[in-house]
């Protein structure tokens, strides 16, 4: 403060001031510019410092104006490159564009910081003018940063291509997966071949039909359809064999010959001696084949009456396993069956 006061006093006393002596702005600017950096030895040095500082202040303002225009141009250039960067990143994913915008915002922040640094150093005119080339150098180095920004989409593009390549390989793996599933789907066909083997052992005639059905069907549907068909064929075969076994052990053709073991559902009575006759006239007289049969197990004595043209022709009597009372018709011939339970002779005309 004392030095500034001496400078103002020297200017007022000598009368060599270029500006009005009552101007406080210049004194304040002299206080800001020279208060912290210089120590005045005499009033003449203060006057020279004032003139030099005023000139350098003007130079600094001009320099800061040029620097502002440079920053404005560089900002426009960065916005242009930012647009091109966004256009380049627009061709790629949205995540890459966000990364490019974040990088450009950081770059703009670095420009703002570099722009503020020379203005903060402006109070020392020589130092700001000396540091201005470094600021320009930093602004000149900005295209390298922008170049790295411009190069970033290419790196991102390579990463995008890598991700697309990985996606393609993933799709290829997915495409290959159904083939694996197809192999798995073909496995039940092998199991089904094992499942078809017992049915082939049960019925040899059905096995070529099953193989033909396997050859005609697609490989994808072969597992479930053939398995169901094999199970159905085995179930039908089992039912057919059961029916054939029941038929074999069931009703016999109506003849005179005795049969073997009857089913357990028939009537089981006491053992009787039944009179047999292979041919008996309408009067009940046995003409041939007369004899005696024992009703073992569930056998019964049965009489058959044969009618032709509504007239009784002959009768047959014997021991039979099953004896339902019924009437049978065949080509004008009627046969009446009469069961004689617990009777040795059932010749009842």
UniProtKB/Swiss-Prot annotation:
Family annotation (Pfam families): UPAR_LY6
Location(s), subcellular: Cytoplasmic vesicle, Secretory vesicle, Acrosome
Top-level taxon: Eukaryota
Feature: compositional bias, Low complexity: 221-248
Compositionally biased tracts (Basic and acidic residues): 63-114, 178-189
Main location: cytoplasm
Keyword match Protein biosynthesis: no
GO CC list: acrosomal vesicle
Residues bearing glycans: 342
Keywords (A to Z) from UniProt: Cytoplasmic vesicle, Glycoprotein, Repeat, Signal
Tissue: Testis.
Signal peptide span: 1-8
Region (Disordered) location: 1-265
Biased composition (Polar residues): 117-142, 154-171
PANTHER family named among the record's database cross-references: ACROSOMAL PROTEIN SP-10, URINARY PROTEIN RUP /ACROSOMAL PROTEIN SP-10
Family: To acrosomal proteins SP-10.
Protein's UniProt name: Sperm acrosomal protein FSA-ACR.1
Species annotation: Vulpes vulpes (Red fox)
């Amino acid at each position: 403060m004392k030095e500034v006061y001496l400078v103002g006093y020297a200017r007022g006393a000598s009368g060599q001031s270029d500006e009005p002596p009552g101007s406080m702005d210049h004194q304040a600017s002299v206080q800001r510019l020279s208060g912290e950096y210089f120590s005045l030895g005499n009033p003449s040095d203060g006057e020279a410092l004032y003139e030099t500082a005023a000139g350098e202040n003007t130079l600094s303002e001009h320099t800061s104006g040029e620097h502002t225009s440079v920053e404005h141009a560089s900002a426009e250039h960065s916005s242009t490159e930012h647009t091109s960067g966004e256009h380049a990143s627009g061709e790629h994913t949205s995540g890459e564009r966000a990364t490019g915008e974040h990088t450009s915002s950081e770059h703009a922040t670095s420009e703002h910081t570099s722009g503020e640094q020379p203005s903060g150093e402006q109070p020392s005119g020589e130092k700001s003018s000396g540091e201005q080339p470094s600021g320009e150098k930093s602004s000149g180095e900005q295209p390298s940063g922008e170049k790295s920004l411009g190069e970033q989409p290419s790196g991102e593009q390579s990463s995008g291509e890598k991700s697309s390549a990985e996606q393609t390989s993933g799709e290829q793996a997915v495409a290959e997966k159904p083939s694996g599933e197809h192999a798995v789907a073909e496995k039940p066909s092998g199991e089904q071949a094992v499942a078809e083997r017992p049915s082939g052992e049960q019925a040899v005639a059905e096995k070529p039909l099953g193989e033909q059905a396997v050859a005609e069907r697609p490989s994808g549907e072969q597992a479930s359809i053939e398995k169901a068909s094999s199970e159905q064929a085995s179930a039908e075969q089992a039912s057919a064999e059961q029916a054939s076994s029941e038929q074999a052990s069931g009703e016999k053709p109506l003849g005179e010959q005795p049969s073997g073991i009857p089913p357990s559902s028939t009537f089981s009575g006491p053992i009787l001696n039944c009179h047999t006759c292979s041919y008996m006239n309408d009067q009940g007289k046995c003409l041939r084949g007369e004899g005696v049969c024992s009703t073992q197990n569930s056998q019964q004595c049965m009489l058959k009456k044969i009618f032709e043209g509504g007239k009784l022709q002959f009768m047959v009597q014997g021991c039979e396993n099953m004896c339902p009372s019924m009437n049978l018709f065949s080509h004008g011939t009627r046969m009446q069956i009469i069961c004689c339970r617990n009777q040795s002779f059932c010749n009842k005309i």
